[in-house]
Amino acid sequence: MTEIIGAARALLEAGGREGLTMRRLADEIGIRAPSLYKHLSGRPALELALVETGLEETGVALHRAVAASGSAGAGCLLDAYRAMGSAHPELYRLITAGSFPRSELLPGLEAWAGEPFYLVTGEPHLAQALWAFAHGTMILELERRFLEGSDIDLTWRAGAEAFNAASRAGRCAAGPAGEGQGVGAPALIRGEMGPR
């Protein structure tokens, strides 16, 4: 399954969602297309496996960034988020813009991957606003929608500073963000994914 997911990711990044077909994937790994169905029930299952893989990798990167961030929580989180989106733009688009059946995701995966936004802000609505800033800025950057000459690095930093200030203003007697949190994926998502 690891080889299939790796090849699928390469196809996705090379040709976008439209370029990801079972036939192309089979050709890429050197098997006949019907043999893929022993591992995945079809393209929707393949896309779901890619979304799960992407959420797991993003979650690990974000949890690590928050654990190492100290008082620069939002900045480190946004740096990690931007790095993941920039390194894997088509996977990022599939995760955030593609439609997939949420009910079929590994239980708890999406919430765990998004938890670092809450760990940084300490408040659910502020966490959602931080994610909205991160996602909106990432998509605008990927689509090259900022005005020519815009200092996008400065835009990311300004967002981080604003959210750090808002988090400090709203944080009462709560402990530091990330206190007691692990950085690895939950045990239920660490193993090899089985057939779908």
Model-derived features: positions:
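An amphipathic alpha-helix adjacent to DNA-recognition modules
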Residues: 1-9, 13, 18-19, 30, ...
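Append "Primarily bacterial transcriptional regulators
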Residues: 23-27, 36
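Key DNA-contact positions within bacterial/archaeal DNA-binding proteins
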Residues: 32-34
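Hydrophobic alpha-helical connector segments
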Residues: 49, 63-90, 110-115, 130
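Amphipathic alpha-helical segments used for helix-helix packing
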Residues: 82-108, 139-146
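Amphipathic alpha-helical packing segments from all-alpha helical-bundle domains
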Residues: 96-131, 150-164
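Amphipathic C-terminal alpha-helical segment
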Residues: 132-149, 163-173
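Actinobacteria-biased recognition of intrinsically disordered, low-complexity terminal regions
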Residues: 168-196
